[in-house]
Amino acid sequence: MLNSKNNTIVTIGDINYLWGIFLLIASARKAGMTEQFLVGVRDFTPEAEEILKQLGDVEIVSLDGTSRSLTCLKSKVILQTKTDFVTWADSDAFFTGNVSDILLPANEDEIHFRLRANQEMPMAFKGHSFGEDGMSIPKKILETWQQDIKEIAGDAMEAPRYETTGSGCFFALSLARHRRFVEIWDALQEKVLPTHNVGVVDKSLQFYHQLDESTINACLNFVKDAPRVQEVFRMDKERAKLFVHFIAQPKPWQGWTKRAFRFFDDYVSLVEWAVAQGLRLPGEVPSCLKASNKSLMKLLIPWMTLKPKLARRLKGILKR
């Protein structure tokens, strides 16, 4: 079994994600995980940094001064890791238990990464299917990915390795073995992604609308020495050893979606654990993270889910 101290868990977020980052790290510490955390942050106060550092073995990397979407900077933070292995975990997520023994791929030539089933692809590529059925990566996108990798790396695979793309919210690999792969990924992000803040998706991009996720999938498909995707994704198999990613808005420290609410008790228990440990919290505990409000939060799900959608629609109208 690999030494957990030779693996760094990397995440990223701005001050609006302080609760999310805090609870991600807290979930690891509550479960007895000892991995280092490297956190890329923007607009953090010294106090906010200390709130994370009190959780133990947490290093902060300031990303102030860059206007890019933070999701486009994942590779830059990963490259600052000092350990041989690295695990990426999005900050709107948590571990349900001690997962140290399943984080890393069994083989250093592999990456622990979840490829989508064909049935998931139409949603991921909605509006970007180029007239195809959407069940696999569109040919036009693959052609662009291949050409961009060839320009950056000097050569590229003649054919894609995978039919479908994978989720960029979690992955783990040997950085000692695959640093060049991450450097190519970083260079591709510099080349093709916006330099301003566009959020986590940019539908105006024909070939890279999922930003960091599109670019890492391009690299996995066409970089010649890319790590192979591990055959079995292990972070969604056992209830006591899950990586839970809160995909949609609102995030649990703001409100709850129907899908996320399944994990209400687990997530709130992290706040209760932090309080019992005497830790400084990111602020007053939000009402949506109080066990006593569980029934109310369930009733409010339709409104809390609709609110961000209305806000986005209004923002779009005002931009016209």
Task: Specify the residue positions occupied by each region the protein language model found.
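Glycosyltransferase catalytic domains, chiefly GT-A lineage
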Residues: M1-R320
